[in-house]
């Protein structure tokens, strides 16, 4: 988190969301005080006028600062929180590598693995969405293979330490 005076951080998130989980995990790793407001996106709570007034995209997570500033998109939140900490490298090359893996997660991993998790866990057995599973699983396996390939040569995704 950029060097700012200590402030109250409020996360509007859904506990079952992987994108919310990673924000919560970094907050815990950084030992930052925060308030969690559970927003059940599956029940439409991100589509209310009050929520949409703060986040027109109607998604979680949403980080709200005590001065009213709002930051959305999980990886933008992670970047802002990690800036200036050991969780985001200062060296430009390694910082770019961290961004590479954040982008990879959102564009190659999450669209297959998280969506497959949703289809399997939250849609009825007779849902037409079940037909997507073979394609999602294939894409998920490809994403995991890329990660596995990287980790065969490196202990961590970015840099020499955790």
What positions do the PLM features span?
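Proteins with a high burden of low-complexity, intrinsically disordered sequence enriched in S/T/G/P/A and R
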Residues: 108, 160-162
């Amino acid at each position: 988190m950029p060097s700012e005076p200590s402030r109250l951080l409020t996360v509007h998130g859904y506990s079952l969301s992987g994108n919310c989980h990673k924000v919560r995990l970094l907050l815990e790793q950084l030992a930052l005080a925060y308030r969690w407001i559970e927003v059940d996106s599956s029940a439409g709570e991100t589509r209310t006028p009050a929520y949409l007034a703060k986040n027109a995209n109607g998604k979680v997570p949403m980080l709200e600062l005590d001065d009213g500033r709002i930051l959305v998109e999980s990886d933008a939140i992670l970047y802002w929180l990690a800036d200036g900490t050991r969780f985001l490298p200062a060296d430009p090359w390694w910082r770019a590598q961290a961004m590479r893996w954040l982008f990879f997660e959102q564009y190659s991993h999450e669209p297959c693995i998280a969506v497959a998790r949703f289809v399997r866990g939250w849609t009825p057995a007779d849902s037409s969405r079940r037909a997507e599973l073979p394609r999602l699983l294939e894409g998920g396996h490809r994403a995991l293979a890329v990660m596995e390939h990287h980790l065969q040569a490196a202990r961590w995704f970015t840099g020499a330490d955790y």
